[in-house]
Amino acid sequence: MDTTNWLALISLVAGLMAPSAVSAQDQAEGKKLYVTYCSTCHGESGKGDGSAGLSLPVRPADHTNGAVMNQLSDSFLMDIISKGGGAVGKSTFMPAWGGALNEKQIRDIVSYIRSIAVPPKTTGK
């Protein structure tokens, strides 16, 4: 294998091994979307204490609780936001936002949720 091919292979492997980088811009956009679409139930700080959420028979998720949120995969969070709670075995009070939000927007919201969870999710676990 020549040098060019080796360098290409090393770059590919390094790219696959590196954790996915989430930009500050993605998180900032996620926060804007979160405030618009999620905060009514989950609260602006993400504690599940939004004005509409307080009147529900099931309390909305506290996105700041890292002990709980870190157990959920990004894929699961994407599904619950996109398809709604009932589609993933959770509360049917969680609406499906897949018709209003595209995949990038939902990914940005997940990125923002990850940023407010304490303790934060660590990679590789």
Please report, for each region that a protein language model flagged, where it lies by residue.
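Bacterial N-terminal signal peptides
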Residues: 8-18
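The canonical Cys-X-X-Cys-His
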Residues: 30, 34-44, 94, 109, ...
